[in-house]
């Protein structure tokens, strides 16, 4: 039995390629160890059978953006640094239209954008793509967000019109919001760059109590049929 070495080193020796090429083959899901795909270049091997799959290419996986339907009550969601934890606990949507096979590399160095509070549910974005990170992290808040908010109580007369103009509450002016009734207990609220607590305070400012909220749209991108607790890839032609 030989001493264990990194899979990338063993593969490079076996193929006569560079260590970097070997790493790319492994990260791309092209390498099997005793019949199992291994995506970690640092995985230790000794006498196992190493196999390079047909059609293998030593190319970097392009950066991706992932969309998650966050469940209510997830305490990790308010922490942007917990992207990998959130995604690890979710499931890839079986009806994802993207022709991509999930790889470990797709979950590395993901940035959580526009995080939701613990009590909220709905659409969250994780991205490795610089242009998307810049657009969604823009402090000027140019991108609309749409929420369905379950409420209790009786609103004051003309309350929804006040929200559209910008209303003061607890010593600060809240962001302008377009609001309409979806049914007797649900409001559809559209606004830009809400801060934590803003939706609750918007409701309180017109005499309502927020029971729950769900984000259903960011920019032009709707959550649509993505099930709770599942994620999918952002499609090549989809835009926020």
Residue ranges of each PLM-predicted region?
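Basic, flexible Lys/Arg- and Gly-enriched helix-loop patches that mediate nucleic-acid binding at interfaces
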Residues: 2-240
């Amino acid at each position: 039995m030989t001493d264990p070495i990194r899979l990338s080193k063993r593969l490079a020796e076996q193929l006569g390629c560079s260590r970097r090429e070997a790493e790319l083959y492994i990260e791309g899901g092209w390498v099997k160890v005793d019949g199992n795909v291994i995506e970690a270049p640092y995985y230790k091997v000794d006498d196992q059978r190493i196999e390079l799959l047909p059609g293998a290419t030593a190319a970097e996986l392009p950066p991706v953006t992932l969309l998650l339907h966050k469940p209510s009550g997830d305490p990790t969601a308010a922490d942007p640094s917990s992207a990998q934890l959130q995604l690890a606990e979710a499931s890839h949507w079986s009806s994802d239209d993207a022709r991509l096979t999930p790889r470990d590399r797709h979950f590395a160095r993901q940035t959580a954008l526009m995080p939701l509070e613990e009590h909220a549910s709905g659409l969250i974005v994780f991205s490795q793509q610089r242009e998307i990170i810049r657009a969604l992290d823009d402090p000027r808040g140019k991108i609309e967000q749409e929420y369905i908010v379950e409420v209790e109580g009786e609103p004051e007369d003309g309350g929804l019109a006040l929200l559209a103009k910008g209303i003061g509450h607890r010593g600060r002016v809240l962001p302008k919001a377009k609001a309409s009734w979806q049914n007797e207990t649900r409001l559809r609220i559209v606004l830009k760059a809400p801060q934590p607590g803003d939706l609750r305070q918007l409701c309180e400012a017109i005499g309502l109590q927020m029971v729950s909220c769900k984000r259903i749209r960011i920019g032009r991108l709707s959550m649509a049929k993505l099930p709770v607790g599942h994620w999918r890839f952002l499609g090549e032609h989809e835009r926020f």
